[in-house]
């Protein structure tokens, strides 16, 4: 029986690895979309000697130092600049960094799963990120290699959980780096505070005091990456511009950078339930299964004080609070759109850990009696079936024909890039925001928006017919003379 289980485990592990490879390969060839292109302007400008600056397409269409509208931070974009400095292809080279973080995310979940509830928990946890569906809206996560900050932030949060029991200071630093991958990672702090409290010895006020003693250094270190970034911004911009930068950052954080019709909590929860490659009711049922197993496990260990139990409770409590912070904020933030990208760092980091907690709960129940011993595995099998269904759905989605791919974009942009090089055109204006952004960045020109004052007299790239003279044309895009 043990041999059969071992064979089954490794066959399933190999199948899951194959699914990851298929999704990664599909993601590398996916359309280079506007948010990725907007992010790529920062490492390009840094290498061009213009500083840590975007093209400012959403900030007046001028070179903008430490642009607050770039929500993907230096934790991601500085490594991208390092890769590009060695002459790597701009798009594929840039996408290697999120891919590295994706691998780190899966590896961290495997470590947590193995440590907490054995190899089967590790396998299920490694499947959860594949089950998440970031597509389906105008601001997607297309896959593991998108040049965005959500996956890197999630990976760093997971590794913070890995090191927290023995190196809380390092966990704090990793959380700080996650914040500088995506500012929304700040919402993870309450979860880590609760995790530290669970690990602290004593009871009552003594435990709170111990938590404060253990938590001050990680909290300080969590702020170090952001402090360094803002110090660099101060010396790059000067006092007056730095104050404007802070105001812009505060405005962006408060407003989410979007102006949409107010959304409701039911709409948000419905969107989250639909963000998996299974029907929403299956996603909800899976969540209920996880909660039942976790609660059952916690009830089963009442009165036990083993270190292994405390570590499991730490993970469950910290991840539950972390997940609630992300989903709760997003659900109640009426000014934010129905984009699962917003809570994605918390979903990708903490939901898989809660699945680990569910498997741990099943194991704890197995020690309580015949009924619990039979019920736990049945619920885990149902949980596993849901994940298998979702992962297969993700793999099947990669076979759906795409209207545009990275390869087709390259072919469309080739004549425009050649024209930009020959004419030395420094800027092109995108008309409108959206599909026209990425071709401009791929052409090698700086990108602005057609209606910005700074773009007066600048040629415009569009997918529509030109109303002025056509300067150069590809199969999908063309450059029109300035009106």
Language model region names:
Residues 9-13, 127, 173, 219-224, ...:
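Signature aromatic-anchored transmembrane alpha helix within multi-pass, membrane-resident enzymes
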Residues 14, 92-117, 159, 295:
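Transmembrane-helix motifs of polytopic, lipid-linked glycan transferases
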Residues 19-22, 185, 327-333, 357-359, ...:
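Transmembrane alpha-helical segments
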Residues 24, 91, 95, 102-105, ...:
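Aromatic- and kink-enriched transmembrane "portal" helix at the membrane-lumen/periplasm boundary
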Residues 149-150, 181, 187, 333-367:
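Hydrophobic/aromatic-rich transmembrane helices and adjacent perimembrane loops
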Residues 156-170:
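Membrane-interface transmembrane helices that cradle and orient dolichyl/undecaprenyl
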Residues 212-289, 322-323:
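Membrane-lumen/periplasm interface segments of specific transmembrane helices
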Residues 406, 410, 414-468, 474:
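Short periplasmic/luminal acceptor-recognition loop of GT-C membrane glycosyltransferases, typified by
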């Amino acid at each position: 029986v043990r041999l059969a289980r071992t064979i089954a485990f490794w066959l399933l592990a190999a199948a899951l690895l194959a699914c990851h490879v298929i999704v990664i390969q599909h993601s590398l060839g996916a359309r280079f979309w506007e948010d990725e292109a907007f992010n790529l302007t920062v490492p390009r400008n840094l290498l061009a000697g213009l500083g840590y600056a975007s093209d400012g397409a959403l900030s007046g269409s001028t070179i903008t130092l430490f642009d607050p509208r770039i929500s993907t931070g230096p934790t991601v974009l500085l490594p991208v600049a390092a890769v590009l400095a060695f002459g790597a292809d701009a798009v594929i080279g840039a996408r290697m960094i999120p891919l590295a973080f994706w691998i780190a995310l899966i590896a961290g979940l495997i470590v947590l799963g193995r440590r907490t509830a054995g190899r089967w928990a590790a396998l299920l946890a490694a499947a959860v990120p594949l089950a998440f569906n970031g597509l389906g809206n105008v601001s997607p996560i297309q896959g593991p290699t998108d040049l965005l900050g959500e996956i890197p932030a999630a990976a760093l949060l997971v590794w913070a959980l890995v090191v927290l029991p023995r190196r809380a200071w390092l966990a704090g630093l990793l959380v700080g780096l996650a914040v500088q991958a995506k500012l929304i990672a700040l919402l993870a702090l309450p979860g880590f505070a609760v995790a530290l409290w669970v690990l602290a010895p004593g009871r009552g006020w003594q435990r709170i005091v111990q938590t404060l003693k253990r938590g001050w250094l990680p909290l300080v270190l969590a702020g170090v990456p952001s402090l360094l970034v803002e110090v660099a911004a101060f010396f790059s911009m000067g006092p007056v511009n730095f104050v404007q930068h802070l105001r812009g950052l505060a405005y962006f954080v408060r407003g989410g950078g979007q102006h949409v019709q107010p959304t409701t909590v039911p709409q948000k929860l419905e969107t989250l339930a639909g963000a998996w490659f299974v029907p929403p009711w299956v996603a909800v049922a899976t969540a209920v299964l996880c909660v039942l197993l976790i609660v059952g496990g916690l009830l089963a260990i009442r009165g036990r004080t083993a270190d292994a139990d405390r570590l499991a409770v730490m993970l469950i409590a910290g991840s539950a609070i972390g997940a609630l912070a992300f989903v709760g904020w997003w659900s109640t933030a009426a000014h934010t759109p129905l984009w699962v990208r917003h809570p994605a760092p918390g979903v990708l980091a903490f939901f898989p850990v809660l699945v680990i907690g569910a498997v741990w709960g099943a194991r704890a129940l197995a020690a309580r009696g015949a009924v619990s011993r039979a019920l736990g595995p049945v619920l885990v099998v149902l949980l596993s079936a849901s994940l298998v269904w979702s992962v297969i759905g993700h793999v099947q989605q990669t076979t759906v024909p795409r209207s545009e791919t990275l390869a087709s974009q390259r072919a469309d942009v080739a004549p425009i890039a050649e024209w930009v090089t020959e004419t030395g055109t420094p800027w092109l204006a995108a008309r409108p925001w959206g599909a026209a952004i990425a071709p401009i960045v791929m052409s090698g020109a700086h990108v602005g928006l057609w209606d910005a004052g700074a773009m007066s007299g600048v040629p415009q790239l569009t997918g529509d017919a030109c109303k002025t003279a056509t300067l150069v044309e590809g199969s999908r895009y063309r450059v029109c003379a300035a009106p």
